[in-house]
Amino acid sequence: MHGSNTNWVILTEGDAVTLVDTGYPGDRARLLASLAQVGSSPEAVAAVLVTHAHNDHLGSAEYLRAAHGTPVYLHQAEVPHARRDFPHQVSVGTVLRNAWRSGVLPWAVHALRSGGTAHVPVTVPEAFPAPGALDLPGRPVPVRTPGHTDGHCAYHLPGAGVVISGDALVSGHPTARTGGPQLLPDLFHHERPRAVACLDVLAELDGDLLLPGHGPVHRGPVRDAAHRAREFAL
């Protein structure tokens, strides 16, 4: 599902759903409408899985947890980030230093209006309860892909050939110079070398449908998409 410059994924199984990411805080109405669009509701969300705890992916996670008791799961290394024990978000200073770059200023204005700098911690984030496939609709398998943040995770659906890549591999962004599989621009990564290295992790996943955190759905071997992004990154 496409929000305002960011995506989330709804995995359905009977009456229950798994929600992967939640968009910006300002995307809440769109998020709830997207659940209704697939015949679901906030009460039916079995869990929120978070790729990483930036505001444009975490925006409504605490709302769902507090209002509906929805558990919010993410990698152990990302738990303190979700609580806002420390920031791994691009700083205002970094954005201002890069404001001359194409697309950065319009993106920044939109991000501010959508709650990009709002304080939206998850009060009780939870690490994945067990290794391997999660016992949730879609049976997603967390795949650790640090670099964008310390605890960034992609999610693999082996039986469906789907990879939900979050911001470890995207297919577009308002600040990007081109479309197609790529890393986000450098200013957004906590540790760019690790982000580049994790493209090799994604290349090992069997799939032909890439659902990125930003940009359109990408169809074709995920391996090829990851290799293309790595070539552009080097």
Feature names for model-found ranges:
Residues 217-234:
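Binuclear metal-ion centers of metallo-dependent hydrolases, dominated by the metallo-beta-lactamase
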Residues 24-26, 79-146, 150-221:
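Metallo-beta-lactamase
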Residues 1-38, 42, 155-166, 171:
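Conserved beta-strand hairpin/beta-sheet module of binuclear metal-dependent hydrolase folds
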